[in-house]
């Protein structure tokens, strides 16, 4: 994989001014983003998140998932901490793309869970890859991470590329009546480490 750094700009947000670093995968044409806040110390653990694109949750306020809640909470946590990063990866629908995600939602509306819907469309439950994160983290100067995630695959991916995950920080927010079954499936079938007692209900 060939990841090329492109440019950096300021990104004012409700939680403060982040820096937005643009990257291009020259093999696939996909464009990824790293957000950084404050001064990142390469010798100390940095609070961060690897976030896969979710148009419906991040931008359209969907209650079918917890993605938008996780992104906003991660940005708020980073701002309150004073420094940190988010890698925003263009892997919509756990890697199957937006239109296939809508097809999967249609199957879920008919009774399939999130894993079954992917499989009925001929896809694995999770097609995401994380090999692009190494050059992105190298560019922003991060070697040791306090990773905000419930997904053990992300912890494993970081360790495999030589990034030390000092701590896994749970990010359990956004549970509501529309996504309760989805979150349960992520826990029971995809191995996400979640406890219903830590969710913040959003009705």
UniProtKB/Swiss-Prot annotation:
GO annotation terms (biological process): riboflavin biosynthetic process
Entry binding sites for GTP: 49-53, 70, 92-94, 114, 149, 154
Pathway: Cofactor biosynthesis; riboflavin biosynthesis; 5-amino-6-(D-ribitylamino)uracil from GTP: step 1/4
Enzyme active site: 126, 128
Keyword tags: GTP-binding, Hydrolase, Metal-binding, Nucleotide-binding, Riboflavin biosynthesis, Zinc
Listed SUPFAM superfamilies: RibA-like (SSF142695)
Gene3D superfamilies, A to Z: GTP cyclohydrolase II
Bound cofactor: record note: Binds 1 zinc ion per subunit.
Recorded catalytic activity of this chain's protein: GTP + 4 H2O = 2,5-diamino-6-hydroxy-4-(5-phosphoribosylamino)-pyrimidine + formate + 2 phosphate + 3 H(+)
Stored NCBIfam families: PRK00393.1 (NF001591), ribA (TIGR00505)
Entry function: Catalyzes the conversion of GTP to 2,5-diamino-6-ribosylamino-4(3H)-pyrimidinone 5'-phosphate (DARP), formate and pyrophosphate.
Protein name, per record: GTP cyclohydrolase-2
Classification of source organism: Bacteria, Pseudomonadati, Pseudomonadota, Gammaproteobacteria, Alteromonadales
